């Protein structure tokens, strides 16, 4: 397929909704993660050794999240995509109120690591589903969207830190997660409506 043919997918409004949803969701996760080490030291008051251990736990949990997401996306993709932003919002709220408790934050980071591993699969699935006829280009768009989300959210979360302190960095994550809900549900509604029409 020629480059010109692949670029035509950019005229699809559904692709743009999907890209915005992915930008927001990835931003929610990695905007906060960008400041996690500092958060663990200054808010949770973990020692340097425990910060390293906690970050390792986060990374290993990503692997488990990938496995879980693979199964759920193959079984009940729309339900999983729909509930994910709410789960992440709840986790950030728990982190907001209990993040200053050392061992509690390690448990929160474990669960968050699993969710972040899931998000990588959700993001790629969401864009690929809309642009399934141009898989290579869809993968490139996925990488662009996730990187843009990380950059924008890290900047926004930095503003929250400047204004409200490092302990409120998760407010930036909550903002991005809540905004993503509308875009994901617009996509889910479109897909569900299309499937209902096909079944008639």
Regions found by a protein language model. Name each.
Residues 1-19:
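Juxtamembrane intracellular "pre-TM" segments in multi-pass secondary transporters
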Residues 129-168, 172-176:
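A late C-terminal transmembrane helix in Major Facilitator Superfamily
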């Amino acid at each position: 397929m020629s480059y010109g043919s692949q670029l035509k997918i950019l005229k699809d409004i559904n692709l743009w909704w999907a890209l915005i949803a992915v930008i927001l969701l990835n931003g929610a996760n990695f905007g906060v993660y960008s400041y996690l080490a500092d958060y663990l030291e200054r808010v949770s008051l973990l020692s340097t050794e425990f910060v390293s251990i906690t970050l390792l736990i986060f990374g290993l949990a990503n692997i488990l999240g990938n496995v879980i997401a693979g199964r759920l996306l193959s079984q009940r993709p729309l339900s999983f995509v729909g509930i994910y932003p709410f789960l992440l919002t709840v986790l950030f709220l728990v982190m907001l109120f209990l993040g200053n408790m050392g061992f509690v934050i390690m448990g929160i980071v474990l669960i968050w690591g699993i969710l972040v591993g899931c998000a990588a699969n959700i993001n790629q699935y969401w864009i690929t589903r809309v642009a399934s006829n141009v898989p290579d280009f869809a993968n490139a768009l996925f990488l662009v969207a996730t990187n843009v989300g990380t950059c924008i959210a890290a900047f926004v979360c930095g503003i929250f830190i400047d204004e409200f302190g490092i302990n409120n960095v998760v407010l930036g994550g909550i903002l991005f997660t809540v905004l993503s809900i509308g875009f994901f549900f617009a996509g889910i509604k479109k897909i569900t409506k299309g499937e209902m029409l096909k079944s008639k």
